[in-house]
């Protein structure tokens, strides 16, 4: 129900931003980081670049500083897409819809999340969870 509402509210912005769908809800993994997941959308955006797009719900509007964990998540997905599909993500976008129906769009580049940051996050996770 929430996903349907989020999609309907963000549809006008999505239509303007997405030019071609490459893949949706596709499972990917990284042997290097020993993680797996399923991304929301891989597309060609209005700039003609391969873009990883993620949908998020939020109770209220957020600032870019409040969504750094989502930026990091996109970094891991970008790595998994490269390893699994052999595709190089050029842009990363988050569409966030608030309870009131406000749609926020956050833009990142893969280089915004350096590899060293991903390695540190994964190492920290391993230490906490003993994996």
Where does each model-flagged region fall?
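Mg2+/Mn2+-dependent nuclease catalytic core
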Residues: 26-130
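Metal-dependent nuclease catalytic cores that hydrolyze phosphodiester bonds in DNA/RNA
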Residues: 1-36
């Amino acid at each position: 129900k929430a996903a349907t509402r989020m999609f309907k509210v963000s549809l006008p912005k999505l239509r303007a931003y997405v030019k071609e769908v490459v893949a949706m809800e596709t499972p990917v993994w990284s042997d290097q980081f020993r993680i797996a997941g399923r991304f929301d959308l891989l597309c060609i955006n209005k700039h003609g670049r391969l873009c990883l797009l993620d949908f998020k719900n939020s109770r209220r509007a957020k600032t870019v500083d409040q969504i750094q964990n989502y930026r990091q998540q996109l970094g891991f997905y970008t790595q998994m897409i490269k390893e699994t599909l052999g595709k190089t993500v050029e842009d990363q976008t988050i569409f966030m819809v608030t309870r009131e129906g406000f749609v926020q769009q956050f833009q990142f580049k893969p280089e915004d999340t350096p590899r060293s940051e991903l390695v540190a996050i994964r190492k920290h996770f391993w230490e906490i969870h003993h994996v």
